[in-house]
């Protein structure tokens, strides 16, 4: 028996084979499970990605307008009239749409001082004629970068005519057509894409220009923040489904006033320079203003934020004037001016712009948080001169008819006023009040009481000749792109005003089932209503408070209104919002003091485009190549050509025996100066500030223009011409 094997027993070899078989079966089962789990998971991810896809389109178009004889918009200085070009102005448009639905939103950032009501109404009118109800007042945001170096004259309200010589049709037309064209380009190039958001801190690029006003806010509130400015940049990155780069929008709070009020060259200032750097980086080998990648550096709550980081100094003595009234011992407020980080305004513009660009580049490269979810938009027109604000269960207050205080005329440390006004004025000046009463009429007791403690200089809400001086009907608007909520605000919110608005809207979303929204403020949108200071800042009546035109409760009114829009979006109830009273359209097309274009002439023995002062034969990098031509009024070109170049820098190619354009007038390395002479004559000077790294070789500078020529007694025509410098050599360093 001992030698017999049991029926249930197996040899060692058989046991090994059985174990191997079991292991193989188990492994096969595991692999099959993993395969199907992986496939199901991938299918799920693919489905999520498919649902998360948007249609994305980007576009850029020129909106420069006339670069000569038109006052620049921003500093309200009638002496600051355009006299040439440093950089072109662009409208940058971004469209996001749901592939399977009709919902879409448009965000436009334009290199202009602010979006006026007239610009918005004209843009919406053109969009309606092209696209029907696809692009409307609720889903189109128009935002200005707030450059103070763009042509003025695109407003329909009387106050803005005073320093811009009325309504300037060429400016209005250029801005409107440029915005519409940028939207057209974005519309035509829509493709499936993805959006990513990122945020980070920008250092060494801003200061609070009214720090004493900021200190009036509750200490408990101020203790929650490390700075008296918002240093955070929010960036939205756009790519297509293959990962190809499309563009970006950056929101950051800083005034584009690195170029001061002595400047006469049209340009887009520090944020425009940031756009230029980013677009040149992404559109390799393209001229400035060309290429498919679009980078917008949009405005935010910049009301009290200056790029002039060295702070205010007395221009005559050099001592600091960082005091509550921003005044100097000798010369008063007119001598107190802030300084940027550079040796001059051109270098300061580049330094601040590059700081902003470098942070945006870092955030762009690291952006990984995807924006997903439905699109929504909410909009209302509101009569801001008569909003009831519920502060709490027992207290209700009112906004006021628009009015500007005495400190409005004082200007800021970025651009001082022309007369003996000072910031922080809580009492009127009998001299100026008497002049106001005689010329414009005394403010009503009701308006005076409503605006307390503001001493009223211009009671614009009660001034209606020849048209109202300020808007009553104002746009409030929120656009939601998934988890991103863009608050389109109609003016310049101060740092703390912006923080309060964002927090209030964030809480509203949170409490109605939409937690975790990324809330950003887009400034200078849709209609311009000056500044929005907090109630506490308003009591000190520095410039920003004196320019809070609807009274001390303006911010509270906006918070109430934007909370209502956020609630409607969160509850999918935007259709139930009352549209409100539509804004008026005034017939102001012929109200202008801009000089008419007249017949021009060249000096004896010369013709248009001839060289008057020639370039040198040789230059090195870091030097300035300069040539002066017999010129003509640049307004002729603006009114007779689209996206016309006034100049080119060209390099000679030995291989092709031809000249190749290497720079145009959108470059920040070139400058175009126009100077008007007598008897219909004028000169044009072109400068090329040769940057480091310029390739050695043979170059020339070319000039393009139009002059007015009389054909007969009744007819004047524009004649194109061009000129060229001699060839010159750039030698290796």
Sequence positions of predicted segments:
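Non-catalytic substrate/cofactor recognition surfaces at enzyme active-site rims
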Residues: 2-733
């Amino acid at each position: 028996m001992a030698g017999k094997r049991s029926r249930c027993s197996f040899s060692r070899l058989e046991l090994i084979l059985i174990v191997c078989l079991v292991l193989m079966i188990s492994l096969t089962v595991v692999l099959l499970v993993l395969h199907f789990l992986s496939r199901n998971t991938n299918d799920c991810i693919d489905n999520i990605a498919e649902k998360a896809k948007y249609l994305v389109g980007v576009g850029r178009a020129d909106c420069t307008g006339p670069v000569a004889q038109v006052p620049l918009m921003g500093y309200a200085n009638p002496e600051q009239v355009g006299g040439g070009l440093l950089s072109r102005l662009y409208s940058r448009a971004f469209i996001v749409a749901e592939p399977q639905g009709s919902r879409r939103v448009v965000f436009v950032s334009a290199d202009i001082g602010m979006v006026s009501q007239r610009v918005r109404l004209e843009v919406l009118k053109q969009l309606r004629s092209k696209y029907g109800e696809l692009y409307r007042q609720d889903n189109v945001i128009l935002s200005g970068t707030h450059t103070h170096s763009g042509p003025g004259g695109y407003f329909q309200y009387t106050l803005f005519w005073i320093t811009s010589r009325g309504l300037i049709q060429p400016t209005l037309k250029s801005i409107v057509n440029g915005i519409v064209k940028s939207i057209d380009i974005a519309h035509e190039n829509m493709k499936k894409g993805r959006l990513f958001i990122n945020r980070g801190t920008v250092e060494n690029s801003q200061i609070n220009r009214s720090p004493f006003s900021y200190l009036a806010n509750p200490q408990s509130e101020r203790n929650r923040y490390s700075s008296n400015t918002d240093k955070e940049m929010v960036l939205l990155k756009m790519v297509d489904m293959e990962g190809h780069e499309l563009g970006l929008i950056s929101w950051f709070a800083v005034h584009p006033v690195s170029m001061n009020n002595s400047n006469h060259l049209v340009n887009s200032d520090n944020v425009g320079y940031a756009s230029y750097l980013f677009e040149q980086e992404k559109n390799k080998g393209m001229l400035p203003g060309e290429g498919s990648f679009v980078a917008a550096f949009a405005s935010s709550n910049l009301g009290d934020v200056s790029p002039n980081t060295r702070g205010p100094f007395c221009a005559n003595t050099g001592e600091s004037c960082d005091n509550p009234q921003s005044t100097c011992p000798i010369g008063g407020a007119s001598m107190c001016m802030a300084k940027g980080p550079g040796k001059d305004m051109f270098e300061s513009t580049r330094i601040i712009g590059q700081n902003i660009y470098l942070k945006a580049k870092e955030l762009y490269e690291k952006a990984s948080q995807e924006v997903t979810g439905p699109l929504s938009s909410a909009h209302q027109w509101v009569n801001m001169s008569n909003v009831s604000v519920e502060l709490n269960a027992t207290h209700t207050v009112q906004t006021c008819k628009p009015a500007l205080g005495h400190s409005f005329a004082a200007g800021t440390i970025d651009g001082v006023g022309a007369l003996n006004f000072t910031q922080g004025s809580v009492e009127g000046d009998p001299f100026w009040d008497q002049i106001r009463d005689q010329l414009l009429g005394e403010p009503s007791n009701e308006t005076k009481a409503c605006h307390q403690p503001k001493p009223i200089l211009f009671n614009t809400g009660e001034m209606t000749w020849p048209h109202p001086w300020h808007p009553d009907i104002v746009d409030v608007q929120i656009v939601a792109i998934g988890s991103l909520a863009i608050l389109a605000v109609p003016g310049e919110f101060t740092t703390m005003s912006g923080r309060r608005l964002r927090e209030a809207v964030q809480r509203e979303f949170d409490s109605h089932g939409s937690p975790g929204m990324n809330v950003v403020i887009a400034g200078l949108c849709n209609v311009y209503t000056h500044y929005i200071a907090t109630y506490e800042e308003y009591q000190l009546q520095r410039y920003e408070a004196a320019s809070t035109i609807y009274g001390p409760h303006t911010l509270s009114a906006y918070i109430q209104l934007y909370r209502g829009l956020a609630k409607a979006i969160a509850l999918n109830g935007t259709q139930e919002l009352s549209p409100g009273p539509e804004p008026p359209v005034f017939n102001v097309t012929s109200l202008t003091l801009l000089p008419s274009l007249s017949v021009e002439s060249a000096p004896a023995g010369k013709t248009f485009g001839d060289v008057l002062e020639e370039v040198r034969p040789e230059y090195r990098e870091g030097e300035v190549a300069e040539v002066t031509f017999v010129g003509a009024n640049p307004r002729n070109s603006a009114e007779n050509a689209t996206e016309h170049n006034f100049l080119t820098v060209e390099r000679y190619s030995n291989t092709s025996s031809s000249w190749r354009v290497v720079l145009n007038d959108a470059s920040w390395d070139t400058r175009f100066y126009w100077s008007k002479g007598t008897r219909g004559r004028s000169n044009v000077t072109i400068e090329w500030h040769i940057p480091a790294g310029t390739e050695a070789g043979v170059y020339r500078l070319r000039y393009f223009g139009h002059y007015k020529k009389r054909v007969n007694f009744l007819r004047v025509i524009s004649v194109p011409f061009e000129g060229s410098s001699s060839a010159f050599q750039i030698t290796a360093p």
